[in-house]
């Protein structure tokens, strides 16, 4: 199936669209606008709330390196994040990517599907800014801490915060004034310069109207 934008509906193709043709592009662009999450490494079964480790591809080293660097800043290099052995502090085995458009929210929840909750989660933000709420171990408890996270910001959930409720009640749009100051949010020039190919225009426009949150963690 692909979206027929002129007729505002779906049409069935006799065969799948080929890479690079117009129908593939229109189908991909429509689906990209609907994208809300993806897995990095082992797929996550949202129904059973388990990671399918037997089908786990390797996490991209660039993603793992960025998260390890974040943890080194927080805990210090002596924590030995990438040393070989069963007791290493962080391996970055799997990740979840969440995609938010302005108006999207993420309800309060706890990341507790991993077997070892003593290991941290490193969370990286790209694109649009958002409000991040960190609560307590119960939704009924206070206080709740509110932070504005911008593109390039990182959050580490470790220790007590690893099992605390957290969520995203608000995503700002490009050009919107942030509540904490009179400054207007603009898409980072450094991030925009990464889209330097002619074919990247659609991806750049997608990034400008999306918040991407990538959280890396260990299953075991």
Summary of predicted features, one role per range:
Residues 1-220:
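Non-heme Fe(II) oxygenase metal-center motifs and adjacent flexible, charged/small-residue loops
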